[in-house]
Amino acid sequence: MDLFKDITILSLEQATVLPYLTYRLAQDGMQVIRLEHPIYGDPNRMIGENVLGEERMNAYFLCINAGKKALTLNLADPEGQKIFHSLIKELNVDIFATN
């Protein structure tokens, strides 16, 4: 939908509810950028069948993240925190979502 194309969401998400919500918003045309820890990754990577034959790229993870962009960022590191704050400013984030 063109109605939502100018809305940017930065999402720090895991589990089921928020990833599903941001999936729906991405399908409605919003730009969704999800943050993922560079070492631990998203636990959803391990759910479902391994349909591609690639490590940590299982079916549920692929489906629930369709239409989203992704960045890896270590928020425990001061440099990661600095990048996080600059992302919010420079991307003109309309919504920050976390669970």
Which residues are covered by each model-predicted region?
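N-terminal helix-loop segment corresponding to the beta1-alpha1 unit
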Residues: 1-99
